[in-house]
Amino acid sequence: MDYKNLVAERIKENTELEVDLIEKLIEIPPKKDMGDYAFPCFQLAKTFRKAPNLIAEELKEKINKEGFEKVVTVGPYLNFFVDKTVLIKDVLEKVLNEKEKYGSSKVGEGKNVVVEYSSPNIAKPFHIGHLFTTAIGNALYKILSFEGYNCIGINHLGDWGTQFGKLISAYRRWVDEEALEKDAIGELLRIYVKFHEEAEKNPELEKEARLNFKKLEDGSEEETELWNRFKDLSLKEFNKVYDMLGIKFDSLAGESFYSDKMDAVVQEIDDKGLLVDSNGAKVVMLDDYNMPPCMIKKSDGATIYATRDLAAAMYRKKTYDFHKCIYVVGTPQALHFKQVFTTLKLMGHDWADDCKHVGFGLVKLANKKLSTRNGDVVFLEDLLNQSVEETLKIINEKNPNLKDKEGTAKKLGIGAVVFTYLKNNRERDIVFDWKEILSFDGETGPYVEYSYARGKSILRKAGELTGEADYSKLSSKEEFELAKLLGGFNDAIMNAIDKLEPAMVTRYVIEVAKAFNKFYNAHGILNAEDNDVKLARVKLVEATCQVIKNALNLLGIDVVEEM
């Protein structure tokens, strides 16, 4: 039984409000002794022409209370206490019947959602900052897919621009082929940095680089061959990280893909009378929207990011007819996307309202213990590998006889890092601290994983239990609170979709783990007072494990069965 929906239906019977609106207004009371659901009656004051607290009293008398233990008023709120036995039975049966599908729905059926995320620059380091966009985008992709949306995951690679002209010049002068084979990104970064050092002494290098890129734009075989090599070498390195994270994309259409589509976009902007000359550059004026102009072409005629993003948005709408197009890109780019979306609207594309920028913060290291390859950039692959190594040390200390220690350390170590990136509001900065991230206490990935493994250990020891569970035996506060929390999984997912915030699921699974451990510490499970209680509690453990697994999977984190 969906109690939130039941509350909404009962209120609808006595008001003119629609169920969808009522569900959005329903709150969870701040204290557990105040009830399970609360409806604020302020919304009805105009319709009923009475004070909200009087409306609450009247509704309490009229409302059908079947399925609830009681309905009470708390000032202007109408508070509902659910029938605990019915709720526990309904939730556990639903979880155990639906298993890996529990929490899913068909709410997004028939709707396409484009998610652009990760998007590293070719020939540049895949550093720890990139995990923000990669982890958030992957989680949103999984969450939306779980609710029936048809998602298209796009890795919008930074694979075009004048920097490739510079890289071609640098490659021809200074590349060490042996180093390139061993550490492609490191070597490409080295020669790119050297180019900038040398260009300060010799400005002719910049001219040469521009000529190289012009040749690349014109399809020169030699330049194109080098560009493809840089791209292939980079993707080979990037794929090591994607494989570690278990991430795949539906499209790798990066900036270069739109290079032949931008002239048509510029022409359309011009045809709409939006293109203005500004010191030789071509811009769209956005003064009426309190924004600086959106630059479309630089004074030398080159297109920039905005032009490419306009071309990409138009191509995606035409190709995928998206319901939403989500851009998981750092918060500093917020103005850029506002300019792009506003320009699309001015061009007459009202679907620009369906384009959403999902920003995120920065990542900082609490200390400098993580070595860097070039002194200032922390490569993501190195971070993940170090996390696995540190986790293996902890496992060797805590459980040296564990089977498949390396496999467990890999899942735990990588999962701990991803969990940290997804734990708090995405716009908050992360301070990366190994001690906290890999701790088995507190609000961490290992704590949630340990809770799951503890539950699975109980289930293995319990073996096959026969008979039908009598859920009325689950009469304690801890059992009810855990079951009620399990019943709220879909609400957490829908909140994550509404706010485009995976942390709603991360915070939820932390609360499930906490509630499970409270229950575990308060009650005997395998040594329960009788077999009926034992069976009911084992079923509660089984349902909890299922929900934790489902939630972690949505976050892109593998569970470990044993620790």
Curated annotation (Swiss-Prot):
GO terms for biological process: arginyl-tRNA aminoacylation. It catalyses: tRNA(Arg) + L-arginine + ATP = L-arginyl-tRNA(Arg) + AMP + diphosphate. One of its GO terms (cellular component) is cytoplasm. Keywords: Aminoacyl-tRNA synthetase, ATP-binding, Cytoplasm, Ligase, Nucleotide-binding, Protein biosynthesis. Its EC number is 6.1.1.19. The keyword Ligase applies. It comes from the Bacteria. Monomer. This is Arginine--tRNA ligase.
